[in-house]
Each structure stands twice: as structure tokens, then as C-alpha cells.
Regions:
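Conserved N-terminal segment of class I S-adenosyl-L-methionine
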Residues: 1-93, 99-101, 242-245, 254-262
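Surface-exposed alpha-helical interface segments used for non-catalytic interactions
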Residues: 23, 72, 98, 113-117, ...
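GHKL-family ATP-binding catalytic core of two-component histidine kinases
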Residues: 91-93, 110, 164
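S-adenosyl-L-methionine-dependent methyltransferase catalytic module, highlighting the catalytic core
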Residues: 3, 8-16, 113-114, 118, ...
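C-terminal beta-strand of the catalytic ATP-binding
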Residues: 265-268
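Helix-to-beta-strand junctions that scaffold the AdoMet/dcAdoMet cofactor pocket
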Residues: 109-110, 123-125
Length: 268
């Protein structure tokens, strides 16, 4: 029987870190109601799969992304417009959303404040702003390994490694968003597996791709990019169960802050 599952969802099922991010977001959205207006903003490393799964939780969702490379495919997949946005101009009214979620945007910005002020502006009074970024702690072993093999922040399209939880809280507080919850995910083993995948794509596969691959792209983001690495992706699909099992060793670091952090704040 032919499988009609969208390629975005098939690809998501073979991810590690993206699944952990969705799991963490679900915990922060546990009080979401069907009438809540919600906004998700991403920054290029998104094919729409996480949007799909968040939409399944309920609420009335709007979508936005900073880059245009996959917006058309995302809009077609989701059946709803994905807005292209800039850091100081979100095309939404003031006080519009009960939940505003930013996924891995701040580390791309020289100055995080204009964008964070926009998150504050479009959130309703008392609404929640949830921000996730890479952990900016450069002393973490996995981060040191990344930098030592040339997978620096620039390869990911970042202007900084990220933010640790106290730094991210300060950014939110500076823009009148009061932090009220925090979490983290992705420990050493998941990071090393992700690094292996990203290193292979950035340094080898993307250079052979027939589809255009923009600087800062660490994994296929469009169907054409995925088709260009189809044979390698099939091989990865075969070893994915082993990767998944290895990633479970992250439990060894249950007391450590993960390599991705999330802070939830409330608009006063």
C-alpha cells in the first residue's frame, strides 16, 4: 500500500533533538485551551512538522518564519499562510495572542531586544511568551567538540552560541516579560549524534546537492534538498533506531542543564 504521509512528517519521525523540543514545548503548553490564539516563530530550520504537531494540541495558530526558503512548502503543507517576518516587524496586531513561541531565533540576532519587544507587543496582557535557544555555555564538552572540528556558530548561521538560562531570563525581563518557568533538553549523546548528522550534511552532502542550499543550513529544509540526498537519507533511516537508543544515554546527565534551553515568561 502506498504511503501518503507527508515527507515533512516522515522526516520528523527520524529526528532526535526536534522530538525533544516538541516534548518540552508540550509541557509548557499543558494549559492550552481550544480558544487560545497562538503564534509560532521559527528561523529557517523548519519544514512545518513542529507546526503540525503543535496545531494538534488545540488552539488557533498563526505561523511565521524569518527565512523564505521553505515558506511556500510549509504553507502548502499546513494549509495556512506562513508569514515571513523580520526582527522588528511582526505583522500581527497588539495584544493578539495568549501564547507566543519563538524557536531558535535569538541566537541569529545581533541585538535580541527589538525582536523580544515584538514578542511582548503581540502577546495579550497576562499571555505567555516561550523562547527556546541553544545553551550559550561554551564550557560544555559537546560545544567544545563542535568548535574544535569547525562546526562553529557561523556554520549554523548564528551570531552567538546561544544563551544560558540566566542570560535568556535577563533578555525577557529587559522587555517587560517576567520569567515564570524554565526547562532544558538535549544532553551530550544527542548532541554528538546531531553533530555527526550536521557535519556530514554541511561539509559533504550539501556541496553535492543539486538543490540550492543556503549558508547556515545544517539539514534538508525543502523537498528538493531532501531528494538530493535521498540515498544517504535511506541509509540514515536504517541506522536511526540505533541512534535513538544511543540518545537515551542522555539520562546519565539528568542533573545537568541541556544543550537547548527554554524559558517561559508572562506579559505583565
Amino acid at each position: 500500500m502506498e504511503d501518503f504521509t507527508p515527507w515533512q512528517l516522515k522526516m520528523f519521525q527520524k529526528t532526535l533533538k526536534k522530538k525533544l523540543r516538541l516534548k518540552a514545548l508540550k509541557k509548557h503548553l499543558r494549559n492550552l485551551s481550544s480558544s487560545d490564539c497562538c503564534l509560532l516563530i521559527t528561523c529557517g530550520d523548519n519544514n512545518g512538522a513542529i507546526n503540525f504537531f503543535l496545531n494538534e494540541l488545540g488552539g488557533k495558530w498563526s505561523w511565521a518564519d524569518f527565512e523564505d526558503k521553505s515558506i511556500q512548502e510549509m504553507s502548502e503543507f499546513l494549509g495556512k499562510e506562513v508569514h515571513q517576518v523580520s526582527e522588528d516587524n511582526l505583522p500581527f496586531p497588539d495584544n493578539e495572542f495568549e501564547y507566543v513561541i519563538s524557536v531558535d531565533v535569538h541566537e541569529h540576532l545581533e541585538d535580541p531586544n527589538p525582536f523580544t519587544r515584538e514578542l511582548w507587543r503581540v502577546a495579550k496582557p497576562g499571555g505567555k511568551v516561550i523562547v527556546t535557544v541553544p545553551n550559550g555555555d561554551e564550557t560544555k564538552i559537546a560545544t567544545r567538540i563542535k568548535n574544535s572540528i569547525g562546526m562553529t556558530k557561523e556554520k549554523y548561521g548564528h551570531v552567538r552560541e546561544g544563551y544560558d538560562i540566566p542570560e535568556l531570563k535577563e533578555v525577557l525581563k529587559a522587555n517587560n516579560i517576567e520569567p515564570c518557568a524554565e526547562s532544558s533538553f538535549s544532553q551530550f549523546f544527542t548532541e554528538m549524534l546531531e553533530l555527526t548528522i550536521n557535519f556530514l550534511y554541511v561539509n559533504i552532502l550539501s556541496k553535492k546537492s543539486k538543490a540550492k542550499v543556503e549558508k547556515g543550513t545544517i539539514a534538508p529544509a525543502t523537498q528538493d534538498q531532501l531528494k538530493s540526498v535521498e540515498k544517504t537519507y535511506r541509509m540514515y533511516s536504517l541506522v536511526y533506531p540505533m541512534f535513538w537508543l544511543i540518545s537515551k544515554l542522555d539520562c546519565i546527565f539528568f542533573n545537568s542543564v541541556g544543550h537547548a534551553v527554554m524559558v517561559e515568561g508572562k506579559k505583565g
